[in-house]
A protein has these predicted regions:
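Membrane-embedded and interfacial regions of multi-pass energy-transducing membrane proteins
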Residues: 1-536
Length: 536
């Protein structure tokens, strides 16, 4: 009976912490499923002209690998998981403003996953970008493509509801004092929510038009009926490129927060620089979508505009990187600490991926490299490594607050070393592939590349081992019960006042709280208005 009650409590919970944990569990499951697909892809490249799996199955794998990793691994953990958990705590609230909408957002994700698994079974090999005419009924008649569209529709509605909830909650926080130097994490989640709310309806419209083309005889993207398939690319990438920043902005906030605490500083160095750099990235990132389309025949003026603005995005990103380096330079933290190693790994790998992005932003070079493995290497360094390392940093940082136990330092050091070796062995040689002209999305290749493909495959196995190793470290901490003695750092942040593990459905505050990093003064009240203490 107690087990059933606990199950029902989790099933019908409105608590932001439990919903965040549910999001995270779904994300971990999807992440390992996507990893298994990536291993099958890499195994297929062990032999140059012999396919371990059929070509149709290969198309199914690359389609579902991309969609799983982006929509069901990175977004649920970074936004649904840690966003749900951290926004109320860092804002001084007991929950999000719309808890029922929060629960609905999660439970829309479950049928979305079911539809995606159904599409896998029925077959949907249209690529994660599902461009027409390949995704039209003429060339992809399988009903699996329709289930894939429905899956993305539900995932999009879930994200829109979460974004509305986050914006309402953060508005109630910032409306008290807009000039408050609140946590950078809150600002990055606000910008992330604005990006999602702006771009997801455009993707939903594109998917709806494609469904009508496939099932009701319309011709939005069919040239024979007066449609334009390039229109779909514009609509898709109007969402697709800001999605990159949706996945990396929470990581920017977390790295800024970690650097602040490791420096034991009373305030973030260059706070307004970080916030306005994030805002600049949001604004610029929303108007550069066509740099994914340099090979479709854009006119010269359009290509030059999108190429130039893409290069400008490197400026606010550089402001962030140098701000983090300055804070790390002035920190007294042990340089062998796992959190320090991971933050440095994030800065180095993400910066390297950004530099290759500057290379691709030149429309002349992109025309040559667009359909090669160079692009695969670029977006894996930025999205896969940047966002994945953000998740690892968040787990290491907030695990004591969530569970009350700390992770094994020496195991984390080993895991960081193994991960970086695996990442770079897997993805760095892909730049060489691209410069040699090896085409992506093709499962056969010239035999002269077999030795370096072997290196990539070994690196992918090491990367998967590191992921499993990290889950083992989480499990080991729960079994060994290494009780956390305190939070990371000594900066004046409100989470340092909360007991760990944090209680279920505590009403911490009875009024909206303006959290000010500049002075670090917090007045904490329980629900019955009994004064607890002041942090100065």
């Amino acid at each position: 009976m107690r087990t059933m009650n606990n199950f029902l409590n989790w099933l019908f919970t409105l608590d932001h912490k439990r919903i965040g944990i549910l999001y995270t569990l779904v994300g971990i499951w999807a992440g390992f499923l996507g990893l298994s697909f990536s291993i099958m892809i890499r195994v297929n490249f062990l032999e140059p002209y012999y396919n371990v799996i059929s070509t149709d199955c290969y198309n199914f794998l690359i389609t579902n690998h991309g969609i799983l990793m982006i929509f069901f691994f990175l977004m649920p953990i970074l936004i649904g998981g840690f966003g749900n958990f951290l926004i109320p705590l860092l804002s001084g609230l007991s929950d999000l403003n719309l808890p029922r909408l929060n629960a609905l957002s999660f439970w829309l994700l479950v049928p979305s996953v079911i539809f995606l698994v159904t599409s896998m079974c029925l077959g949907a090999g249209v690529g994660w970008t599902f461009y027409p005419p390949l995704s039209s009924s003429l060339f992809s008649g399988s009903k699996g493509v329709d289930f894939l569209m429905f899956s993305l529709h539900l995932a999009g509605v879930s994200s829109i509801f979460s974004s509305i909830n986050f914006i309402c909650t953060l508005y109630s926080v910032f409306s008290v004092n807009l000039a408050s130097r609140s946590s950078v994490i809150l600002w990055t989640y606000l910008f992330t929510s604005i990006l999602l709310l702006t771009t997801l309806p455009v993707l939903a419209a594109a998917i709806t038009m494609l469904l009508f083309d496939r099932n009701f005889g319309s011709a939005f993207f069919d040239p024979l009926g007066g449609g334009d398939p390039v229109l779909f690319q514009h609509m898709f990438w109007f969402f697709g490129h800001p999605e990159v920043y949706v996945l990396i902005l929470p990581g920017f906030g977390m790295v800024s927060h970690a650097c602040l605490n490791m420096g034991c500083a009373p305030d973030v160095f260059g706070f307004y620089g970080l916030v306005f750099a994030s805002f600049s990235i949001v604004c610029l990132g929303s108007v550069v979508w066509a740099h994914h389309m340099f090979t479709v025949g854009l006119d010269v003026k359009t290509a030059v505009f999108f190429s130039s603005v893409t290069m400008v995005i490197g400026v606010p990103t550089g402001i962030k990187v140098f701000t983090w380096l300055y804070m790390l330079l002035n920190s007294n933290v042990n340089k062998s600490d796992p959190i320090f190693l991971w933050v440095v790994s994030f800065i180095v790998l993400f910066t390297f991926g950004g530099v290759t992005g500057i290379v691709l932003s030149a429309c002349v070079l992109d025309s040559v490299l667009h359909d090669t493995w160079f692009v695969v290497a670029h977006f894996h360094y930025v999205m896969s490594l940047g966002s994945y390392i953000s998740i690892v940093i968040m787990f290491i940082w907030w695990w004591p607050l969530i569970t009350g136990v700390s992770l094994n330092k020496y195991l984390l050091q080993c895991q960081c070393l193994v991960s970086n070796i695996g990442f770079n062995m897997c993805f760095f040689p892909m730049h060489y592939f691209g410069l040699c002209g090896l085409p992506r999305r093709v499962c056969m290749y010239e035999s002269s590349f077999s030795w370096i493909n072997m290196i990539c495959t070994v690196g992918s196995f090491i990367s998967i081992f590191s992921g499993c190793f990290f889950v083992f470290i989480l499990w080991e901490s729960l079994v060994s019960r290494h009780v956390a003695l305190g939070s990371f750092g000594a900066a004046s942040v409100v989470t340092n006042m909360i007991l760990s593990p944090i209680a279920y459905h505590n009403n911490f505050f009875t009024h909206y709280l303006s959290v000010n990093y500049s002075y670090g003064v917090y007045h904490i009240y329980w629900k019955n208005n009994v004064y607890i203490g002041t942090w100065t």
